[in-house]
């Protein structure tokens, strides 16, 4: 439930999400389900999956201009990245050149082919995965690309009861295709506007800014979170509050989002250390300061 709440908050906030998890935990199923549950302008949202490999080329994901001999002109064939929901599977298995092509559409919400610019449909959401176990043949994501992801989440393994229900129900592709939209396109846009309008008390907004700034001076980090991280943090806080049925942000929201929003953006001085532990310590210290008036 917590994972779905955070993922929904990321979508409502207009951000992209990085999933760091092992194979077979349902990342593709989650992305497909989201695409089925939100209606687009002309039916369900368009879902595309890109399997990143070392031999992938930029135009494999962005699209390419093809010469049409009948019209004697070039015709643009869109790539899979020009969809509503894009699952970028094992993004760290492709070259930096291809990663930068994905970075452009994530950051600018457009693809440039030659002198032409093409935009993905709205809403546009990238759900990228990387495998933390396998390291051979990978190209680590640069800080600039990691910073484009609003959150990094992990599904994790299901508990025993959930796993038993999976074995008993044996969910199939037919069950996924049977899902019907629960939000119209207009309702989804209204939800995004409602999320942006959620109230955040100046004290909590200040605490969020201080948490981000503290990562830049913390002894455990050689690289702290950027100002963009602060913007993402605030946007995610408001969206999560709406998901939980509130019109205001609480300190619980700050604690819930500190690690998902900030941990993937920092660089550790000691690679054996855990960024999550230090982020939690920073967050708790700032929240205690609010309670004590410090």
What annotation goes with each model-predicted range?
Residues 5-9, 67-87, 116:
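Conserved alpha-helical scaffold flanking the Walker A/P-loop in AAA+ ATPase domains
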Residues 8-53:
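Walker A/P-loop
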Residues 49-80, 137-146:
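Conserved AAA+ P-loop NTPase core
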Residues 68-72, 94-98, 106-198, 238-241:
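Canonical AAA+ ATPase core
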Residues 217-294:
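C-terminal engagement/docking regions of AAA+ P-loop ATPases
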